[in-house]
């Protein structure tokens, strides 16, 4: 263990206590940023709304790949479906899920740190996650679910490589792949590399193949069992297209899904404090490079370090990073950062007093950022609406006005097209897709199916996103059928301050109807 620091190793019971404390702290930080005390949720946003909406589609009898489009395995959809079935469709669900995911990551990170660090250092990676990593990544999507499972699998291998440990780690990799297929597969590959490396150190090369086979068999079994029903329902060809072919060929089309996202985020408008997590997150690959160089130069010179466990952490983290390397947005980097935070603190303890002081600065800074963010969320001005999915807090006035208008002009259960309004208003998407894009991400057959669904269900209202997200004026031929249908069957009735446009179906929308009069009364009664 890390004797050079002069710190003492924590007893297992003390280690667990520290992990629970860091977890509780992380949960509180997230809760006070995502809820207005005591229990009013801030309007959820981001990709989590898509998964929550798909969970609602499952409990209504629909299935991914067959009835709606999905490019990842169904793990996240199923979690939301279970929660919505148990508690109902409420806007507090995504926020509470995110707080629980963050708390779980904090526990795992702290316990992993206890394998390779001593003293107060074991708490620092968890503090970095609560302060810097979660700063702009409170989005409960498949990325966080698969990270929790990948970290849990790594924990199992850190405790040993017996058949029981290998089967458990493999099963968790298979489960991680049920949320993010690339992360689960790459982490499994990292474990295989680790086992082969270990066997070469122990001079038992033949044993490694048996262990690798057990590991991979456990992963494949869990993944196969979890996905079999959906493969059967949609057909193997459709499942392969959605989960493998589409992500490889068409997912990188939008700038958000490729390397251009880095430039977009750096050039985006926003408050200066949005830059706080950028240096730490963009340094993730550098952390791994420095560690591997340090490993090569010092492994034989310093036998006091547990290099096997450190290598496993580094290989796992590198695999997780590679899963998002083609589209390294801040949110995605945040979800794969936990192993890097552990190695960063460990490395800082190896490079002299100045680096050791930097650990203190990072820890204090992380606490300050986390606490300040929570206080800011609780003390700023909020607007509130009683949406069909529950009372919800709004920080953006333009967004509040748009949602208030929609509240007065729609009703739960109606067909409607336009993310992200399905979930908070409990409305139904008539199509297999949730939106359109000018890139190759939107396929011609999806556009044709959307037009058919709008006509079949006579959808009364569409809310189309701002121009940078919704390419209404594009010359892309794949969107021409929708554009022609829109201009023929709908008319623009309102442009919101957000830039979003509301289109009403000609003949099915009467200005001055009862729902409009109800909204007018609501507008006068609501400050």
Predicted feature descriptions by range:
Residues 137-147:
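Short acidic/glycine- and proline-prone juxtamembrane loop motifs at membrane-interface regions
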Residues 96-117, 152:
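Transmembrane-helix motifs of polytopic, lipid-linked glycan transferases
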Residues 38-54, 65-79, 89, 234, ...:
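Extracytoplasmic catalytic/substrate-binding loops of multi-pass membrane glycan-assembly enzymes
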Residues 185, 319-321, 325-356:
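Hydrophobic/aromatic-rich transmembrane helices and adjacent perimembrane loops
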Residues 109-134, 147, 164, 168:
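Transmembrane-helix signature of polytopic, membrane-embedded enzymes
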Residues 151-168, 176, 201-203, 273-275, ...:
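Membrane-interface transmembrane helices that cradle and orient dolichyl/undecaprenyl
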Residues 71, 383-384, 392-441, 450-474, ...:
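Short periplasmic/luminal acceptor-recognition loop of GT-C membrane glycosyltransferases, typified by
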Residues 131-134, 166-181, 187-195, 220-224, ...:
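Membrane-interface alpha helices of multi-pass inner-membrane proteins
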């Amino acid at each position: 263990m890390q004797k050079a620091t002069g710190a003492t190793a924590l007893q297992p019971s003390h280690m667990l206590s520290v992990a629970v404390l860091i977890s509780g702290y992380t949960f509180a930080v997230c809760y006070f940023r995502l809820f207005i005390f005591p229990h009013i949720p801030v309007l959820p946003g981001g990709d989590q709304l898509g998964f929550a909406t798909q969970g609602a589609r499952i409990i209504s009898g629909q299935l991914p790949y067959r009835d709606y489009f999905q490019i990842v395995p169904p793990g996240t959809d199923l979690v939301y479906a279970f929660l919505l079935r148990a508690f109902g469709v409420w806007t507090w669900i995504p926020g509470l899920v995110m707080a629980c995911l963050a708390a779980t990551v904090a526990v795992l990170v702290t316990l992993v740190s206890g394998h390779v660090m001593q003293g107060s250092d074991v708490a620092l990676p968890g503090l970095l996650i609560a302060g810097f990593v979660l700063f702009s990544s409170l989005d409960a999507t498949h990325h966080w679910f698969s990270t929790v499972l990948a970290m849990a699998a790594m924990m199992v291998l850190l405790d040993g490589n017996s058949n029981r440990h290998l089967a458990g780690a493999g099963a968790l990799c298979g489960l991680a792949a049920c949320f993010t297929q690339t992360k689960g597969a790459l982490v499994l590959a990292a474990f295989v590399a680790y086992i082969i490396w270990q066997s070469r150190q122990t001079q038992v090369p033949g044993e490694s193949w048996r262990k690798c086979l057990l590991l991979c068999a456990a992963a494949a079994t869990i993944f196969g069992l979890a996905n079999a029903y959906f493969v059967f329902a949609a057909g193997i060809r459709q499942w392969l297209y959605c989960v493998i072919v589409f992500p490889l060929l068409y997912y990188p089309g939008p700038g958000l899904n490729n390397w251009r996202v880095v430039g977009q985020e750096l050039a985006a408008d926003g408050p200066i404090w949005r830059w706080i997590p950028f240096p730490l997150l963009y340094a993730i690959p550098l952390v791994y490079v420095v560690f591997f160089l340090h490993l090569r130069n010092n492994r034989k010179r310093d036998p006091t370090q547990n290099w096997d466990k450190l290598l496993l952490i580094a290989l796992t983290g590198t695999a997780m990073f590679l899963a998002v390397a083609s589209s390294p947005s801040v949110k995605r980097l945040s979800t794969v950062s936990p192993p890097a935070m552990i190695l960063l603190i460990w490395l800082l303890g190896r490079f002299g007093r100045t680096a050791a002081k930097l650990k203190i600065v990072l820890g204090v800074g992380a606490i300050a950022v986390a606490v300040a963010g929570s206080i800011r969320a609780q003390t700023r001005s909020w607007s509130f609406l009683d949406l069909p999915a529950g009372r919800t807090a709004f920080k953006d006035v333009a967004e509040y006005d748009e949602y208030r208008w929609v509240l007065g002009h729609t009703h739960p259960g109606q067909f409607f097209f336009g993310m992200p309004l399905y979930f908070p208003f409990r409305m139904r998407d008539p199509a297999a897709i949730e939106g359109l894009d000018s890139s190759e991400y939107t396929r011609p057959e999806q556009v044709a199916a959307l037009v058919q669904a709008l006509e079949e269900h006579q959808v009364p209202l569409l809310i189309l996103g701002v121009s940078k997200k919704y390419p209404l004026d594009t010359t892309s031929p794949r969107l021409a059928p929708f554009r022609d249908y829109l201009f023929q069957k709908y008319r623009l009735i309102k442009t919101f301050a957000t830039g979003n446009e509301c289109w009403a179906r000609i003949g099915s929308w009467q200005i001055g109807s009862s729902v409009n009069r109800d909204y007018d009364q609501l507008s006068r009664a609501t400050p």
